[in-house]
Every structure is written in structure tokens, then in C-alpha cells.
Regions:
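Short coil/turn segments at secondary-structure boundaries
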Residues: 82-91, 119-122, 218-225, 245-246, ...
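Scaffold signal of the M16-like zinc-metallopeptidase fold and its non-catalytic homologs
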Residues: 39-43, 211-238
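Short, flexible active-site loop motifs that bind/organize anionic cofactors or intermediates
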Residues: 56, 189, 221, 233, ...
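N-terminal export/assembly segments and adjacent metallocofactor-ligating motifs
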Residues: 1-213, 250-254
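Intrinsically disordered or highly flexible coil/loop and linker segments, enriched in small
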Residues: 79-83, 116, 176, 215-216, ...
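Active-site phosphate/pyrophosphate-binding segments
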Residues: 206, 225-279
Length: 279
């Protein structure tokens, strides 16, 4: 991002055309970032509650006063009840490299309790670790050269705009694009309007079809996987007709998706939080 500054104040924000992912384009949120930075309603000093919880009785204090009071309260709790009585909780407001990790170093040093900050991403992360051994994905710069792209449980135009623009490049280059989502979230690609909460059934149905059709890499499975026979038994009960009834997707679409997954290489599968955010 390129920022123009005059007299110590940011005047304009522009995308960096040399950036390999954004390619000079800023999302709508960042295009309007200066409105938030210089908003007269923005809080610039800490507020301390001086009334009962649930009321709007606050007063401004200095940063030094805030640091001192917070440190005093934390030390008081640690002395009386132990460090584990302190429970830090933070997530999306602190996703920068420094402002995310530095507070965690403080809490780790103090020996406080720690909990997962989210009910969504860690569930998927743990599942990915069990299946793949890790949760790191492909480089987004590989999207334009992919021949098959699947966005599963992901609203690309809204939550992954830069990646979605790369998908457009790939489609222009001849790639096939699927979107698996109950809602139609864009004009691009083939939309599979899956019934909510049935993504696992679709995955098992795809696996069963590929296994029974002998469309999988046996050498890779034998060399790098454990429990394949048990997985085969679990997937066996999910034939295309049953999966179609449960997911509200046609047998033809499920078969086409399955065969494309086997035949079209290289592929790029992007899993979104949508798969995890249901009961």
C-alpha cells in the first residue's frame, strides 16, 4: 500500500501496482480506512468505568494511568488466585504480526490461562492437521496457473477479493471454477447450492465415488496415509444417490465435480469458514 503524507497526516491511500497479490487494488474497507483513522468519534485515550456495569459512566484517563491500573489488577489477581485466574481473550482486532504476538508473550511470561480465541478457525485447523499434518495452504500466486479451482464455504467477492481477482485470471486462462455454497456469491464459475450442514456428506460422497471408480493415486495413499481401509468403510455408505438426497445437489453435478477433482491438474481448493460455522 502506498500512503501520501502531508504535514504528518495521511492524505491518500493507494494500492501498490507492484504487489504480486493485490496488484494495486485496495478492498473497500481499506479504501475508506482514513475515515476511521481521522474520525472525530475515534477513541484516542483510554476510558475507565466509574459507574456500574451496563451504564455509560466512563472517564478519560492517561495511557500511563491505564498501564498502571491494568498491571496492578493483574498482579493483584495473580498474587491472590494464581496466574491461571487471568484469562486473555483476543482475536480479529489483533491480527498484525506484532500486535498479535507481543501481548501473547506477556501472558505466556505471566503463566496465565490460554484458550482458543475462536470457535471456527481452530476447528478447521485441527482437522487439517489430522488429515494433512499441517494447515498451511498454497501460495495465492498459484491461483492464476491452476486448471481447477474450488471455493468451498467461501464468499470470494466479499471476503477474499484479491484471491477472487486471481480466479478471474485463471478462468480467462481456461480454468474450471466451482463454488460450493448455499448462497450464490458471484457470477463466476459453476455454483453448487449445497444444503447447509451437509458439506461432510458431500466430501464423503466424492471420496466414495473416486475410490469405487478406482480414480485415486494408490501409490500415494500407500506411502503417505494411515487408516485408508477404515476411511473406505466409512465412505462406503455414501453413494451418489444418497448424497444427492441429503445435499440437494444433483447426481450429475456430484459426479462431474468428483471426476474433475481426479482428472484436472493442477487444482486449487480454498476452504472457507462457512464449513465450520454451523451446529
Amino acid at each position: 500500500m502506498i500512503t501520501t503524507v502531508e504535514d504528518g497526516k495521511a492524505i491518500t491511500l493507494q494500492g501498490n501496482p507492484e504487489h504480486p497479490i493485490t496488484q494495486g487494488f485496495l478492498c473497500w474497507k481499506i479504501q475508506n480506512a482514513l475515515k476511521f483513522v481521522y474520525s472525530p468519534e475515534r477513541l484516542k485515550r483510554p476510558l475507565k468505568r466509574v459507574g456500574k456495569k451496563g451504564t455509560d459512566n466512563f472517564k478519560e484517563i492517561t495511557w500511563e494511568e491505564a498501564y498502571r491500573e491494568i498491571a496492578h489488577q493483574m498482579e493483584n489477581v495473580r498474587t491472590k488466585h494464581g496466574a491461571e485466574a487471568i484469562l486473555p481473550f483476543h482475536y480479529y482486532g489483533h491480527m498484525g504480526l506484532l500486535n498479535k504476538q507481543l501481548p501473547q508473550r506477556i501472558f505466556t511470561t505471566l503463566g496465565t490461562s490460554n484458550c482458543s480465541p475462536t470457535v471456527c478457525s481452530n476447528a478447521g485447523r485441527t482437522a487439517m492437521q489430522y488429515v494433512y499434518g499441517g494447515f498451511w495452504g498454497l501460495d495465492p500466486e498459484e491461483i492464476p496457473s491452476s486448471k481447477l479451482i474450488i471455493f468451498w464455504g467461501l464468499n470470494g467477492p466479499w471476503s477474499n477479493l484479491h484471491g477472487y481477482n486471481m480466479v478471474k485470471q485463471a478462468v480467462r486462462n481456461g480454468a474450471k471454477f466451482y463454488v460450493i455454497d448455499p448462497l450464490k456469491t458471484g457470477k463466476l464459475g459453476k455454483h453448487l447450492a449445497i444444503k447447509p450442514n451437509t458439506d461432510g456428506v458431500l466430501a464423503l460422497g466424492i471420496a466414495n465415488y473416486l475410490i469405487t471408480s478406482n480414480m485415486y493415486d494408490k501409490e500415494h495413499v500407500e506411502k503417505y496415509t494411515h487408516g485408508f481401509e477404515q476411511f473406505r468403510e466409512v465412505a462406503k455408505g455414501f453413494d451418489l444417490e444418497r448424497v444427492s438426497r441429503i445435499t440437494d445437489l444433483s447426481v450429475e453435478d456430484i459426479r462431474e465435480l468428483s471426476e474433475d477433482l481426479y482428472r484436472i491438474r493442477p487444482s486449487f481448493i480454498h476452504l472457507g469458514f462457512g464449513i465450520q460455522k454451523h451446529l
